[in-house]
Structure formats: structure tokens, C-alpha cells
């Protein structure tokens, strides 16, 4: 998806911010895979607005290079940067603008389905990583679609997700073909909103690229259904499953 052809960057953080608790959860998950390995330089590939970049710098006391093809996303990331250990560069997964053997961790969040050429992107990750270092991937996969909290309210999103998202096995095949081994894979469940009413407000921000692809009629119908559910007592927290891959 070409984010620069949309206005998603302007509301991305509003729709995607799940709070410090979820950010801490993901830093703990990443740390559990890196363990005692010394991490001095991190590539945040597909960094978007930099949601994870400064948290990575703080957790590992490391330099973080955020790379993203979207000018609008990078403008937002640079505008909110507070940590001098973090910098942002334009680039794509298929041609990472970094030297060989230059990073100790590649962090990727929900980017796999955006790669034009996933096999080339995986080879690029292998190229820039130092020997034995971790490529950590958060990803949506087809196997989780039925568990995504908005699918029941936006049924037209299901075929879009089925077309865009890879199968779990395909993600592994792509990285293993690039010379990685799959050290671990798991599913982590994160809270995305404290209630369905709060979840509706997040989705209304228009930050989800799948929902942004729906017709206005289908999107509005889904929002009505979600808000009706919230009004009828959908006060429970909303959760979402995310696939995690540790490639080395």
C-alpha cells in the first residue's frame, strides 16, 4: 500500500496507539528472544511513524535506524523524535540502505504483507544482520483472521485479509530460503482497546489499511454495527492475536 497516496499517516498513531503497557509487553517479548546477546545497532524496518523505535532504543540502550518508504510516515516519526539514539531513513525492505553485517537486531512490525518482494526483503535482512543475530517479526497471518476483533463487524474485510495476509508456513519458507532458520514462532495476544466503545473510536480514526480499502458504505455499516455492540454492553477489553517469528 502506498501510504503517501492516503492521509493515514496523519491519524496512524491515534488508531494504532495501544498504550505503554502494550509497548512494554512487546519490548519484553523481543528481549526474551534476544536474551543476553549484546545489541548495539537495531534496524526498525518498516518503522512507520516510529511507534517502536524509541522503545527499542531505551530497552537495549542501542542506536536505532528506522527505515520506511513513506515520506509522510517518516515526517511524523521525525516530528516526535526525542531520543538522539534514533534516526530515520527512507528505504524499502527490498533495498535496505545499510551496509552488510551492520546491525545486531532487525525488528519488523506488521510489514511482511507490505513487501513487494518478500524473498528479496528477507535476503536483505540476512545481508545487513551480523552473524547469529535475530530478525524479529510481528505479523498478521491468514490463520488468525477469524480471531481479529473487527472481522465480525466488517465482514467485507475478510476477503481483503485473505488476499493480503500470508500463510504462517509461507513466512517461514521465505526467511528460511534466505538462509535463516526459524528459532521460534509463537502467537502473542495484545490488548488493543479497553472496551468496544474505545475500539470504535480507534477504528474511526482510519488508520487501518484494510478497513481503508473498504467502500464508504461498508465501512460506515461496520462502524454502526460496532457502536451498537458497544452500546449494548460491549464493555470488555478487546484483544488481537499477533504472530511472532524469531529468525536467525
Regions found by a protein language model. Name each.
Residues 1-38, 51-55, 73-76, 80, 134-164, ...:
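Conserved class I S-adenosyl-L-methionine
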Residues 49, 183-248:
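Conserved Class I S-adenosyl-L-methionine
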Residues 163-178:
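Short alpha-helix
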Residues 41-43, 49-95:
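Class I SAM-dependent methyltransferase SAM/SAH-binding core
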Amino acid at each position: 500500500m502506498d501510504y503517501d497516496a492516503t492521509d493515514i499517516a496523519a491519524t496512524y498513531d491515534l488508531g494504532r496507539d495501544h498504550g505503554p503497557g502494550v509497548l512494554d509487553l512487546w519490548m519484553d517479548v523481543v528481549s526474551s528472544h534476544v536474551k543476553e546477546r549484546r545489541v548495539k545497532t537495531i534496524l526498525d524496518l518498516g518503522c512507520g511513524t516510529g511507534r517502536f523505535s524509541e522503545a527499542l532504543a531505551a530497552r537495549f540502550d542501542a542506536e536505532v535506524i528506522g527505515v520506511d518508504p513513506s515520506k509522510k510516515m517518516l515526517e511524523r516519526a521525525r516530528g516526535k523524535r526525542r531520543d538522539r539514539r534514533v534516526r530515520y531513513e527512507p528505504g524499502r525492505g527490498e533495498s535496505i540502505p545499510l551496509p552488510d553485517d551492520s546491525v545486531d537486531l532487525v525488528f519488523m512490525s506488521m510489514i511482511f504483507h507490505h513487501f513487494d518482494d518478500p524473498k528479496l526483503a528477507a535476503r536483505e535482512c540476512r545481508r545487513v544482520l551480523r552473524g547469529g543475530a535475530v530478525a524479529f517479526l510481528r505479523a498478521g497471518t491468514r490463520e488468525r483472521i477469524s480471531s481479529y476483533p473487527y472481522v465480525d463487524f466488517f465482514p467485507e474485510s475478510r476477503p481483503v485479509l485473505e488476499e493480503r495476509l500470508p500463510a504462517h508456513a509461507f513466512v517461514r519458507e521465505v526467511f528460511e530460503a534466505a538462509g535463516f532458520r526459524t528459532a521460534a514462532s509463537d502467537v502473542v495476544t495484545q490488548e488493543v482497546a479497553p472496551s468496544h466503545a474505545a475500539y470504535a473510536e480507534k477504528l474511526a480514526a482510519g488508520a487501518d489499511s484494510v478497513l481503508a480499502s473498504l467502500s464508504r458504505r461498508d465501512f460506515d455499516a461496520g462502524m454502526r454495527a460496532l457502536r451498537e455492540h458497544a452500546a449494548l454492553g460491549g464493555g470488555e477489553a478487546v484483544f488481537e492475536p499477533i504472530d511472532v517469528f524469531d529468525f536467525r
